[in-house]
Every structure is written in C-alpha cells, then in structure tokens.
C-alpha cells in the first residue's frame, strides 16, 4: 500500500514540476531601454539591454576585474597609446567578420555627438585599425580607468551601421 501510494504521489508531483513551454520571455528590469543603439544613451536599462545584444573590447568580471571580450589582449606602448589585439573568427549577426575597423568605427562613433557616450570616453583622441586584428587607441594623456570606460562601449558592424544610416 505504501509503495503504491508513493508511486501515485510521485507521478502526481512530476506533473506539477514539469517544464513549461512558451513563446514569450518575460524579463523584469528597473526601467525601459530608451533605444537599441548602443551609443545613443548612457543609462542603466539601455546598457542592460545592449549587453545582451552587443559585445565590447573588454567586459567587467563578477569581481569587477576587467576581462577580455572581443579583445584577446592589450598593452600600452606609451602613456597615451593602447594597442588591442582582436579575437579572430568572430562574426556579426549577418555572418560578416569582425575587424579592427569595426571597433575603431564604433569607438569613434561613440565619441562623436549626438552620442550620449561622449563624456564617458572624452579622453580618447583617436581609435584606428592598424591591421585587421589590431586597434590603436590614443588618449589625451594617461588614463588609468580607460579599460573600465571601454566596458560600456559596444561594437557595431561598420558596414551594417553605414548601410542603415547609423
């Protein structure tokens, strides 16, 4: 009797805890994203959404350390010059390859009005592609928090952005 009751209850509870299948994802956040343009707004909810869609050169780790994301490594060659080596084999949503030109384009776009990121990265004088997988960033002087600032700058496909009037 106990064995039968245990089996019946087990089967009953298995139905209660079965996975639910739905076509809608519900996500709660403290505010609305104002745009899907990663350089248009510098505010929390937009960054939360952008982080789900885009990647940056670097990203904050769980203990707030700076981790590589699209960059596999970086170094400084002078007080005002940073060199980033870009991961190979990264593709955009349309299958095109990520290049250093896309990264330079994104940084330069983010530091140009009407972008809301201008003040965040105002110490950056220029970003340029040295090779397909090497980016150089020149600042207006030593910037010990540049890597932290770059965690908020997301990379777009230059070709896609230009084709779509961004």
Task: Enumerate the language-model features and the residues they cover.
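Positively charged n-region of N-terminal signal peptides that target proteins for export
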Residues: 1-4
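Bacterial N-terminal signal peptides
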Residues: 8-16
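Sec/Tat signal peptide C-region and signal peptidase I cleavage site
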Residues: 17-22
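N-terminal lobe/hinge region of extracytoplasmic solute-binding protein
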Residues: 28-78, 108
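Extracytoplasmic/secreted proteins, especially bacterial periplasmic and envelope-associated proteins
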Residues: 48, 52, 65, 69, ...
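Sec-exported extracytoplasmic/periplasmic mature domains
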Residues: 58, 62, 79, 91, ...
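Aromatic- and charge-enriched surface segment that lines or borders ligand/interaction sites
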Residues: 72-114, 130, 136
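Surface-exposed binding/hinge segments that line
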Residues: 75, 119-166
